[in-house]
Regions:
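Alpha-helical transmembrane segments that form the membrane-embedded catalytic/substrate-binding core
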Residues: 75-82, 123-135, 173-193
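Central hydrophobic cores of alpha-helical transmembrane segments
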Residues: 102-105, 156-161
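Transmembrane alpha-helical segments of multi-pass membrane transport proteins and ion-pumping complexes
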Residues: 29, 106-110, 114, 132-135, ...
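Alpha-helical transmembrane segments of multi-pass integral membrane proteins
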Residues: 119-121, 125-150
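Alpha-helical transmembrane bundle and helix-membrane interface signal
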Residues: 91-95, 138-154, 194-203
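C-terminal transmembrane module of polytopic alpha-helical membrane proteins
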Residues: 1-16, 20-22, 162-204
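Select subsegments of transmembrane alpha-helices in polytopic membrane proteins
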Residues: 13-14, 152-156
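N-terminal TM1-TM2 helical hairpin plus the immediately adjacent luminal interfacial "cap"
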Residues: 10-123, 170-173
Length: 204
């Protein structure tokens, strides 16, 4: 279990991202803001995305909110989702492309959130994680990977994405960020698929 938290060759960025998210969560717990869940006011003070303040010059919130979570179950679910996709995507993409896709889709997901919601305090890595799944989905649909690999993970990816989007309609979940991350990741996947396929064929 501990190996998933230790950066190593081919799996370097994902453990760092998981550790950063956990450190922010632990810091908020130590600060006395809660454990099972945090109040919106405290999240806002720590860097949550909130349209009235974000568009008023605090654009850094588009990034900082992606390293924060609303409570225990929120961070556990997101880190599991990040671990699952990161294990397969990071070795294929390499550190630079992987982190670039993660941060880009995370920020675009935050933009989608403030475009859709006028006064919602939003936090979580799920927009960026959905971005990775969107990218993964595009590459699977375009058959970038070998058939046996693609079939196995296309089903699990569709189940993960579908389940989480449906859960978003139950309330309290930022589906705008999920959809924004998913679409932006999918588009990036479409753009990069040809190059990635050539890279995989060369490395065989």
């Amino acid at each position: 279990m501990l190996e998933y938290f230790i950066p190593k060759e081919g799996f370097y960025i994902t453990p760092i991202l998981i550790n950063l998210n956990l450190l922010v969560f632990i810091a908020m717990v130590i600060a006395g803001f809660g454990f099972v869940s945090f109040k919106g006011e405290d999240l806002l003070n720590w860097g949550a995305n909130y349209k009235p303040v974000t568009i008023n010059g605090q654009w850094w919130r588009l990034l900082t909110n992606t390293f924060m979570h609303g409570g225990l179950m929120h961070i556990l679910a997101n880190m599991y989702g990040l671990l699952f996709v990161g294990i397969f995507l990071e070795p294929l993409l390499g550190k630079k492309k992987y982190i670039l896709i993660y941060l880009t889709t995370g920020i675009l997901a935050s933009f989608a959130s403030i475009w859709w919601y006028d006064a919602t305090v939003s936090v979580g890595a799920s927009g960026a994680i959905f971005g990775l799944y969107g990218f993964f989905l595009a590459t699977l649909l375009l058959k970038v990977f070998p058939p046996d690999f693609g079939k196995a993970f296309l089903t699990s990816t569709l189940v993960f994405v579908g389940f989480n989007l449906l859960m978003g309609f139950t309330g309290g979940i930022d589906n705008a960020a999920h959809i924004g991350g998913l679409i932006s990741g999918f588009v990036i996947g479409l753009i990069m698929s040809k190059q990635l396929k050539q890279q995989i064929e060369i490395n065989r």
